[in-house]
């Protein structure tokens, strides 16, 4: 069973976490013997566009919001407090070199998390993400270089859903939902360890606490 270091830094500005991912990806590509990493965190309010996303899906003046175009796949989405974001930095050569498999496996992690809270999560044919109660509850968008991953998934636990009204989320005009609508009182703090456990189970790895600084070091410290 492989190791996966779990980094849980709390509330992190988007640009900071983006740079961490880039550094972790570069380190993982250069040092294939390093363990995989899973970052679980929240962001202050921010909007991001995928590499080929249509800017018309931003329904307000871009100057009025914090907005970044990233190298991930997918359309525009919102991140903010109450949404649990996962950034796996995985070397897929140790799993399967198949991006379709990777996306479906991330979805399976989230479906199993929802099941732990008594909520039935579902896939929808032709789309990426997870739905529950007829609403999209989790979005995915990834970047892969030399079979090492970055970006990942966002699970709406109890975010400000009004923030999604400023965009066409993931290019879909259908409603966005949250776990708290289906499981009242649930919090990110409750969901986060469940996500870590489901990730370990589905990917067949052992998650253990890690230190970001050690994982970025030139000399292996993690």
From Swiss-Prot:
Pathway: Protein modification; protein lipoylation via endogenous pathway; protein N(6)-(lipoyl)lysine from octanoyl-[acyl-carrier-protein]: step 1/2. Coiled coil: none annotated. SUPFAM superfamilies: Class II aaRS and biotin synthetases. Its EC number is 2.3.1.181. GO terms for cellular component: cytoplasm. GO terms for molecular function: lipoyl(octanoyl) transferase activity. Keywords: Acyltransferase, Cytoplasm, Transferase. In the reaction, the free carboxyl group of octanoic acid is attached via an amide linkage to the epsilon-amino group of a specific lysine residue of lipoyl domains of lipoate-dependent enzymes. This is Octanoyltransferase. It comes from Gloeobacter violaceus (strain ATCC 29082 / PCC 7421). The lineage of its organism: Bacteria, Bacillati, Cyanobacteriota, Cyanophyceae, Gloeobacterales.
């Amino acid at each position: 069973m492989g190791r996966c270091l779990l980094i849980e830094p709390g509330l992190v500005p988007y640009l900071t976490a983006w740079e961490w991912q880039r550094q972790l990806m570069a380190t993982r590509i250069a040092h294939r013997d390093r363990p995989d990493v899973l970052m679980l965190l929240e962001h202050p309010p921010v909007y991001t566009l995928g590499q080929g996303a249509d800017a018309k899906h931003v329904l307000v003046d871009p100057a009025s919001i914090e907005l970044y175009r990233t190298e991930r796949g997918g359309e525009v989405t919102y991140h903010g407090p109450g949404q649990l974001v996962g950034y796996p930095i995985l070397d897929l050569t140790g799993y399967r070199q198949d991006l379709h498999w990777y996306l479906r496996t991330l979805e399976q992690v989230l479906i199993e998390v929802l099941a732990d809270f008594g909520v039935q999560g579902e896939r929808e044919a032709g789309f990426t993400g997870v739905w529950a109660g007829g609403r999209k509850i989790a979005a995915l968008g990834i970047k892969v270089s030399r079979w090492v991953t970055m970006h990942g998934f966002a699970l709406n636990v109890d975010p400000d859903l009004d923030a999604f009204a400023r965009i066409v989320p993931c290019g879909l005009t259908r409603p966005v939902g949250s776990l708290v609508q289906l499981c009242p009182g649930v919090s990110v703090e409750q969901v986060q360890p469940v996500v870590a456990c489901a990730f370990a189970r589905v990917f067949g790895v052992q998650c253990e606490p890690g230190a970001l600084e050690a994982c970025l070091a030139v000399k292996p410290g993690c």
